[in-house]
Curated annotation (Swiss-Prot):
One of its GO terms (cellular component) is membrane. It is found in: Membrane. The chain crosses the membrane at residues 7-26. It is a single-pass membrane protein. Keywords: Membrane, Transmembrane, Transmembrane helix. Induction: By removal of nutrients, in a cAMP-independent manner. This is Uncharacterized transmembrane protein SSD449. InterPro entries: B12D. It comes from Dictyostelium discoideum. Its main location: membrane.
Length: 75
């Protein structure tokens, strides 16, 4: 049977507390987000939010071409 070094107990307490706090913060962040949530309580439905979630392809390609050609430097 392995012997336990009790001098490492504070280390395990600190690391364990850090893991628990990180997990709790992540859970709180995910559950309070307006678009992505772990529960449906307080979740924003798509019909209630008419704004687009993603940038359309033409806007993206326009930004890319502006950067690629260096037009933003010339203006």
């Amino acid at each position: 049977m392995a012997r336990i070094d009790y001098a490492t107990a504070p280390l395990f307490v600190i690391v364990g507390l850090a893991v628990v706090l990180t997990g709790a913060t992540g859970y709180k962040r995910l559950s309070s987000d307006q678009d992505i949530s772990l529960t449906r309580k307080g979740q924003m439905l798509w019909k209630d939010n008419p704004t687009h979630k993603f940038v359309d392809r033409n806007t993206t390609m326009g930004y890319f071409k502006t950067i690629e050609t260096g037009k933003y430097l010339k203006e």
